[in-house]
Amino acid sequence: MGRVITFAGLPYREAATGVKRAPITGGDMKEMSAEVIRVARGAALTEDVPEGSDRYLFTLTGGATVSGRDRSLALAEETFAVIEEGTTLTVTNPNAGETTLISVLAPPANSPKRPGFSGGIVAAARSTTPVHAVPAEKKQRIYFVGKGAAASERAHAMIVVYVKDTVTSLHMHPNAESMFVFLSGKTRFTVGGKDVIVERGQATYFPTGDRHGLRVAEGDGVSFLEFHVPAAFVTVKD
């Protein structure tokens, strides 16, 4: 069953000095493993990306520096980074305030392998990445993985923007898992057959075959970061 996650209420644990992390997804998700990582000013986290997995990082609040494979990239707020398997990755926070990151492994370690991202480390800021209009659906999309962005068969990731009357009807993915991280506005989301209102600071996730739908709850629109894992997903509408 799909779940609603509120980041402020998660059970954070200290992963390194000045670094706390907590899981978003649970054992019901087999294709992706997601967590929130909070990095204090001047703190750093170093770890390896497992073989067979892509690592995705999104700066939800604040900025960060991501280093690995003899490359270092500065990430502004709302920037998406893609990191190749086997990379020894270091994330640091050079800024004055705490940085909050959304971290995703697709798939988790020791999973069946699919061709993944092979470009080392790349990053794309929301503010400078092309926006693709989908007039028939009253949506805009900003692609980070797939659709001409970073190439991988392990996931599809994008920011989606709705206007006030955009509606995505109930549907499910029989061959993929989904996660939504809310960035702006209030969204009316059908989770487990019930409508809930979600906003920034929250996420929803759905195991394979779990029905969900969404629309703007109030105001002029919403935006959210959306993952489907793996990339070759099928959508079945009610």
Predicted feature locations:
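Short glycine/proline-enriched turns and hinge-like loops at secondary-structure junctions
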Residues: 49-51, 94-96, 155, 172-173, ...
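Catalytic core of Fe(II)/2-oxoglutarate
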Residues: 94-95, 197-199, 210-221
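A short, N-terminal "cap"/entry segment at the start of jelly-roll beta-barrel domains
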Residues: 1-33, 46, 96-155, 169, ...
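Histidine-centered metal-chelating micro-motifs
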Residues: 44-46, 50, 79-81, 85-91, ...
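Short, conserved beta-strand element in jelly-roll/cupin
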Residues: 38-39, 49-66, 159-163, 172-189, ...
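Short acidic-glycine-tyrosine-enriched beta hairpin
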Residues: 56, 70-85, 193-209
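Structural motif
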Residues: 63-65, 88, 98, 186-188, ...
